[in-house]
């Protein structure tokens, strides 16, 4: 099975609508590792690692978003797979990439 890592930035109404919690739940069900966090500019940033087809499904999920969100743009940057995550977490703290 091919592995993939996607670094994703989601724009729109994605703060205060449980976007991170729903992202974590979706990643858990897909067996994806990585993290998600809010950014101070109003976007959400996430990194997804796992089987290529499951990461693709997770990126597509981001385009739809959580029930109360309204996604306007999803930027995806492909990165080399590192295999550094054993679970998917909501992170807090330092801003930036």
UniProtKB/Swiss-Prot annotation:
InterPro entries: Acylphosphatase, Acylphosphatase-like_dom, Acylphosphatase-like_dom_sf, Acylphosphatase_CS. The keyword Nucleotide-binding does not apply. Keywords: Hydrolase. It catalyses: an acyl phosphate + H2O = a carboxylate + phosphate + H(+). It comes from the Bacteria. Its EC number is 3.6.1.7. Residues 5-92 form the Acylphosphatase-like domain. GO terms for molecular function: acylphosphatase activity. The active site is at 20, 38. PANTHER family: ACYLPHOSPHATASE. Belongs to the acylphosphatase family. This is Acylphosphatase. The gene is acyP.
């Amino acid at each position: 099975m091919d592995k993939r890592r996607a670094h994703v930035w989601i724009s729109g109404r994605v703060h205060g609508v449980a976007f991170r919690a729903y992202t974590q739940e979706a990643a858990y069900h897909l067996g994806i590792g990585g993290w998600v966090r809010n950014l101070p500019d109003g976007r959400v940033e996430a990194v997804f690692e796992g089987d290529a087809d499951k990461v693709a499904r997770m990126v597509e999920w981001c385009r739809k978003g959580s029930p109360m969100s309204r996604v306007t743009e999803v930027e995806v940057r492909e990165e080399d797979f590192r295999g550094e995550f054993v679970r998917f977490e909501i992170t807090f703290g330092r801003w930036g990439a």
